[in-house]
Amino acid sequence: KILHGDSATNGFLQSARGAGALASALFIASLGRFSFKGRLLTIGSIAFPLFMLLFSFVTIVPLSLTVMLVTGSALILTMNIANSLVQTLVPDKLRGRVMGVYTLTFFGLFPLGALLMGVLAEHLGEAETIFICALVTLSVSLLIFFFVPAIKKLE
């Protein structure tokens, strides 16, 4: 409704997000072993909700595609580095259990979040729902940034 598009428009938006995700994954892979994972995690954790906030206001398809490209990149940057840090920082004897809980909470909460977003979108509207969820995500990211400064120093 907002972009006055159809299923093809949605396909292009998802493809833009996927292209950004692929670019980010290739970027991270090209770095090999690097010592600034915490800084990249912080950048991605703040960039993702910022660009989702921007997306909630955009009504032009080409600009939406650009925003989704950056959003996909920031999301994969965050997810990839968070996963890597969990696996490398947890002691060997606990890694399996910690990864099990991490995966369960990470992927297990997606459907609940999708349900909540669907209900909110039905009552408030799509753009408003994206705005609210992005604002909550940005707030949490900034709280972590300011109150857990050690994250920026993770290697």
Describe each PLM feature range:
Residues 1-155:
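C-terminal transmembrane bundle of multi-pass solute transporters/carriers
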